[in-house]
């Protein structure tokens, strides 16, 4: 009997992950393409392209073809997907032809944005393409019983978006999607350092600062970190010391928007499911779940237990792949 290869793709703003039914996560590559602006030629894709960010001549730019979880540049996304599918085939150890693919999309994406993702994946050789809402994929990947009539609350803080959803009986009961995620927190840090210290730093440095001394809006033991950048006054390299308290303040507004989305979703919850939320709590997934103190801060703010998924960075990809096994129970969430 003929059996197609089945894979799940987490088409993230920051990273693309591929899940194979038999091997689990087989690929995790940055969603970055390096392009020569004069010839429009693609020079590098994925990890190689990310390593070029901020280090290339003026005519070579490293761009992210995905923005806020949806396609910003169709042609480049197709190039990126072709590269990913080729590498995935090698990882599986066979040249798969016409695989069945499930791709996650932000729950707030438009019909046009979803169609663009579906078409791009089909153009890369997929036989069938199913789209699953990101929070549902995250819930499946976090081992929540999404097909049972109990409330599962997922907060997926990705690179481009934060998705908050209450899932019950295979569908989304209440959901809020905001285009704020890890990338925005990085931008907040870049902007703060530029305004306060007249220092220009790159997004990779900002990400490092966020991961090392970034904290959610909760009391913590102060930390410091030395960073280097370009002095905007002299144009020369300069080293400064950043304090964790000022980085916390830089990210404050974006973190409050995330909290607002969580509160709005919980307020929309039907009364019958509210008891489940108090008992079961909220699950955090995505890279943002790794921010220092975010679990404790959210628990304090929403007065509901908050837990971090076992593999927050991979939950969406795992759930996207696993959803093929329960596709008939998830008709509301899979299109």
Curated annotation (Swiss-Prot):
The keyword Repressor does not apply. Disruption phenotype: Disruption of the gene leads to cells that are curved, bent at irregular angles and affected in length and width. The keyword Iron-sulfur does not apply. It is found in: Cytoplasm; Membrane raft. One of its GO terms (biological process) is cell morphogenesis. ATP binds at residues 13-15, 159-161, 207-210, 287-290. One of its GO terms (molecular function) is ATP binding. InterPro entries: ATPase_NBD (IPR043129), MreB (IPR004753), MreB_MamK-like (IPR056546). Induction: Expression is sigma I-dependent. Pfam families: MreB_Mbl (PF06723). Keywords: ATP-binding, Cell shape, Cytoplasm, Membrane, Nucleotide-binding. GO terms for cellular component: cytoplasm; membrane raft. Forms polymers. Forms a complex with Mbl and MreB. Interacts with the C-terminal catalytic domain of LytE. Belongs to the FtsA/MreB family. B.subtilis has three MreB paralogs: MreB, Mbl and MreBH. All paralogs have the ability to support rod-shaped cell growth normal conditions. The multiplicity of paralogs becomes important under stress conditions. They are probably used to allow cells to maintain proper growth and morphogenesis under changing conditions. Forms membrane-associated dynamic filaments that are essential for cell shape determination. Acts by regulating cell wall synthesis and cell elongation, and thus cell shape. A feedback loop between cell geometry and MreBH localization may maintain elongated cell shape by targeting cell wall growth to regions of negative cell wall curvature. Filaments rotate around the cell circumference in concert with the cell wall synthesis enzymes. The process is driven by the cell wall synthesis machinery and does not depend on MreBH polymerization. HAMAP family: MreB. This is Cell shape-determining protein MreBH. It comes from Bacillus subtilis (strain 168). The lineage of its organism: Bacteria, Bacillati, Bacillota, Bacilli, Bacillales.
